[in-house]
């Protein structure tokens, strides 16, 4: 086998449409675009969501809700994810170092989801009742 003998498998490639090359080709004259209209012109595209001048669905429906600014800097951490932290002290910086939370997170709450087998000390994080019981059952402790 040599580089000059390499070829794609038979039937795996389709020949491109050659438009505007005579009536006999089946794609002559209008080139498969039909007659007149916006879609037949060069650059003739209709932007997504455009409904021909009718008020679009996006504008017919009412606005609602908002994005809470607090949710952008808050995160929940599952109990099982605490095992991924190297060392036995879990705080905001150690969670960021272990890539469990992103760098813009400022508030973390530990929730009961999964299991924890190693004893860890949780510092400066909020903890749910169930998660607190599970951490203490594993030999860990919570510090404010």
Swiss-Prot record:
Protein's UniProt keywords contain Calcium: no
Segments of skewed composition (Basic residues): 32-44
InterPro entries documented for this protein: Ribosomal_uL15, Ribosomal_uL15/eL18, Ribosomal_uL15/eL18_sf, Ribosomal_uL15_bac-type, Ribosomal_uL15_CS
Subunit architecture: Part of the 50S ribosomal subunit.
NCBIfam families per record: rplO_bact
Protein name, entry field: Large ribosomal subunit protein uL15
Annotated gene: rplO
Protein source organism: Vibrio parahaemolyticus serotype O3:K6 (strain RIMD 2210633)
GO BP annotation list: translation
